[in-house]
Every structure is written in structure tokens, then in C-alpha cells.
């Protein structure tokens, strides 16, 4: 049941999810696979055109660095400077409950390793901005994977990350849409998996390309390798899909609404992130329990991080981006 929200919204960005740039500022701070250099234009390679002037990361041709240091506001230790291992366990209190199908899958080490592969995550802006971004990411993904209910022990918002597969993998559809660029592999299904419940071949393809894993051939990797699983969620979070900005840009104040956004009631704040993820289903028709659930997780995590919520938390009166 957890994958339904992303599955529905996936069709809204089928065309735009195949953005060409692979790395750097053009791809939300993503690093190139296999230690390749990231050129000033956001492409991966190993020649001087990629590793020379303007190179953004891994410019020595090794994963040890050599390029400009990504923006950082927390001593260079990224998300680990905001969420400790013990706090992670408190935030996702029941993720390893015996009743949760994903028990013992989503580890702190996998979370940190995946986040560090997207060096702009949790390192952009002042301390409050960085904390709010982390709270927003964990809130949205907690909603997508929640096992909670209204009267659940410790409250409904302590049951995030209970699921890792849509309907525990018991799905009828293969979620394959004909595509020459992202062809489906024989016998594979592309249903919702991981923290963001990534769905469909046209999302598995570019996500896998960005993180250096062939997810078209092996989509099950998203449900068997926790680091890969988290990376698909960070890819979605960091990657703009026109006309939508990236969730990262919204939560770090880098997104400015244009005229169409303003006319549609889309204003900076956590509510736009919900609109990006599942606006076609949840936004623009007044109060919605799913939006409220996303807000509930967000407020809990902000409280635990000691940061204010910011403005415009819901999308009740925002038109979806693709409407």
C-alpha cells in the first residue's frame, strides 16, 4: 500500500524524468559513477574536457577528491552532523519492529553513505535550513513507507520506514511503459521500492544511471541493498523534473516561483515538496489526510531537530504542477 502515492504521480513526470545532465550542480550535486570526473557542464568522463578547467568533483580521476569542496555548513560532515545514529533510531523508532516487513533493512550507515553521494544534501544554507531539509526528506519518505495508524504505539509518526516494497512485492502489474531509452528487462517488475517508492522503468533507468547501478536489469537491488535504496530516494529528492523544481531546491530556498507557480498558488515551503511528489492526487482540492500525514511526520522531525517548521506546510490550495 505504501507505493501507491508515488506510482500514481510517476506518470506525471514520465517524459521529464530523463534529464540529461549526470552530475554536479546540474544534477543536484550527484557524483559520477566509477570515480569519473564531473565537467563544468554536468557530464561524466575521464579526459581533460571533464577533469580540467571547471571540473566540479572527483577531478583527479579518483574518489579521493581533487575537485572543489561541495558547499558545507556543518564542519564538512554533512548529514551525520545533523542526525546522529541515536537520533536516527529515535526518529524512525519502530522501523525494526517485528511487524515491519523492512525490519533491519534501513540502516543509519546506509542513510549516511547514500546522502554523502549527493554532497549538496544537508550542506546547503544555514543550520536551520539544513535541518529543515533533513526533516522534510525523512518526513516525505516516512509517509511513503509508514506502517503507523492513528492509535499506534508512540503515535502514528514514529512508524516510518516500515515497508520497502509496494504491497510486499505482491503486485500484478510490471509497471513497464514502452521506452527505447529505458527498455524494460524481461521478467522484471518496476513497482515501488525503497524510501521514496520509486516506480516504473522510466524512473528506475535514470536513477540507476545517476548512481552507477543498472536498475533496469536488477530493480530488486532497491529492495536488497539499503545504500542503493536510499540513493534512489536522494536522486529523486535532488533532481529537478521540469516544470517541477527539485525538492532540495525548495527546502533550501533556491526555488523562486514563476508567474505560473504564483497563479497556481504554489509558494515556497514544505507544501510544494508534497506537490512535487504527489500533487496530482493530493493537492488542490482542500484538506487531504495524506497531506496532513506528511505534515505530521515533518513537524515531529523538526521538533526533534530543534528547528521551526517554516511557512506554507500544506498544498491544499495549490494546483498540481502538471495540471
Curated annotation (Swiss-Prot):
* Pfam families recorded: Chitin_bind_1, Glyco_hydro_19
Expression induction or repression: By fungal elicitor and wounding.
The reply on keyword Oxidoreductase is no
Q: Under which main EC class is this enzyme filed?
A: hydrolase
Tell me which UniProt keywords the record has, alphabetically: Carbohydrate metabolism, Chitin degradation, Chitin-binding, Disulfide bond, Glycosidase, Hydrolase, Plant defense, Polysaccharide degradation, Signal
* Gene Ontology BP annotations: cell wall macromolecule catabolic process; chitin catabolic process; defense response to fungus; polysaccharide catabolic process
Q: Does the keyword Disulfide bond apply?
A: yes
Q: Which reaction does it catalyse?
A: Random endo-hydrolysis of N-acetyl-beta-D-glucosaminide (1->4)-beta-linkages in chitin and chitodextrins
Tissue specificity note: Expressed in roots, leaves, sheaths and meristems.
What residue range is the signal peptide?
1-20
Q: Where does the Chitin-binding type-1 domain lie? A: 21-61
GO-annotated molecular function: chitin binding; chitinase activity; endochitinase activity
Active-site residue numbers: 144 (proton donor)
EC number annotated for this UniProt entry: 3.2.1.14
Between which residues do disulfide bridges form? 23-38, 32-44, 35-63, 37-51, 55-59, 100-162, 176-184, 283-315
Taxonomically, the superkingdom here is Eukaryota
Report the sequence similarity comment from the record.
Answer: Belongs to the glycosyl hydrolase 19 family. Chitinase class I subfamily.
Q: State the protein's purpose.
A: Hydrolyzes chitin and may play a role in defense against fungal pathogens containing chitin.
- The name of this protein is Chitinase 1
The species is Oryza sativa subsp. japonica
